[in-house]
């Protein structure tokens, strides 16, 4: 229902076919927005639907600059973005998982311990019941909605010490 309401405003109200809807933003939305776009085009013959997977921050910026119709973000809008007139509609909820190499016996980490790992207070897995090995952190790049969500949940905004910062959730 939310998706139908979101796209309803993009269709022509005079029954004529044609036009386009462009979306830009969150890479974690790729599968969902692809399916919604296909359905939208099937129900609106002659209308094209495009998706540019640039990341949440870029999608928000694209809407502000008028380069797309719908910005996709896996984070909430910031106060300054709302002040510029942007409105948000929740389309879905995204999950974030912490993954440890299966050869490392670590399990059941609490949120406080995860935060300590990510800000560098804990640097060896043996300190949390794992192997005697360096903690290597891989995550999303700055501007990513997934990263923003993770750092908001863990209280580690702008403090994480990533070894690698990747440009898509799939790459992580």
Named regions from a protein language model:
Residues 5-9:
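C-terminal motif of bacterial Sec signal peptides marking the signal peptidase cleavage site
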Residues 10-172:
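Exported/periplasmic ABC-transporter solute-binding proteins
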């Amino acid at each position: 229902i939310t998706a139908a309401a979101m796209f309803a405003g993009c269709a022509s109200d005079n029954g004529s076919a044609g036009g386009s809807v462009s979306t830009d933003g969150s890479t974690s939305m790729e599968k969902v927005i692809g399916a919604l776009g296909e359905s939208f085009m099937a129900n609106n013959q002659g209308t094209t639907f495009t998706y540019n997977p640039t990341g949440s921050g870029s999608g928000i910026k694209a809407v502000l600059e008028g380069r797309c119709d719908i910005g996709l973000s896996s984070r909430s809008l910031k106060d300054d973005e709302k002040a510029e007139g942007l409105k948000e509609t929740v389309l879905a909820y995204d999950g974030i998982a912490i993954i440890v190499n299966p050869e490392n016996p670590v399990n059941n980490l609490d949120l406080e311990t995860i935060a300590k790992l990510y800000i560098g207070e804990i640097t060896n897995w043996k300190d949390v019941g794992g192997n005697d090995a360096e903690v290597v952190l891989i995550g999303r790049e700055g501007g990513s909605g997934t990263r923003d969500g993770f750092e908001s949940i863990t209280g580690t905004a702008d403090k994480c010490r990533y070894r690698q910062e990747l440009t898509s959730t799939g790459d992580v």
